[in-house]
Amino acid sequence: LTLVVVTIVCLDLGYTLTCLICPEEYCKRIHTCRDGENVCFKGFYEGKQLGKQFRRGCAATCPEGKPNEIVQCCSTDECNH
């Protein structure tokens, strides 16, 4: 019985990544990613007219940045703060 419990705990069945998802600089909104989305990302751009702009979310792979945007990716829960 102990071996069965240890096996289930180690397999971590049904794990789903959670990422922050909001356009603000300081984000607290947590989103559960869909199956296949194994990366959290944060994009940052500072424009002359609109000031600082952020985008955060889940992705299957690290997205490419838009022109003049810096994108950072990670793969642990809520790592895209």
Swiss-Prot record:
What Pfam families does the database record attribute to this sequence? Toxin_cobra-type
Family designation: Belongs to the three-finger toxin family. Ancestral subfamily. Orphan group II sub-subfamily.
UniProt xrefs under SUPFAM superfamilies:
Snake toxin-like (SSF57302)
Extract the CDD domains matched here: TFP_snake_toxin
What name does the UniProt record give this protein? Weak neurotoxin OH-72
Alphabetically ordered keywords of this record? Acetylcholine receptor inhibiting toxin, Disulfide bond, Ion channel impairing toxin, Neurotoxin, Postsynaptic neurotoxin, Secreted, Signal, Toxin
The disulfides recorded in the entry are: C19-C40, C22-C27, C33-C58, C62-C73, C74-C79
Single GO cellular component term: extracellular region
This protein's record includes keyword NAD: no
Organism whose genome encodes this protein = Ophiophagus hannah (King cobra)
Q: Which InterPro entries match?
A: Snake_3FTx, Snake_toxin-like_sf, Snake_toxin_con_site, Toxin_cobra-type
The entry's note on the tissues where this protein occurs is: Expressed by the venom gland.
> Mainly localized where?
secreted
Q: Which GO terms describe its molecular function?
A: acetylcholine receptor inhibitor activity; ion channel regulator activity; toxin activity
Asked if the Swiss-Prot or TrEMBL record annotates the protein with the keyword Secreted, the reply is yes
Query: What job does this protein perform?
Result: Binds with low affinity to muscular (alpha-1-beta-1-delta-epsilon/CHRNA1-CHRNB1-CHRND-CHRNE) and very low affinity to neuronal (alpha-7/CHRNA7) nicotinic acetylcholine receptor (nAChR).
At the top level, the lineage of the source is Eukaryota
Spell out the subcellular localization from the entry.
Secreted
Which lineage ranks, top first, belong to the organism behind this chain?
Eukaryota, Metazoa, Chordata, Craniata, Vertebrata
**Which stretch is the leader sequence?**
1-16
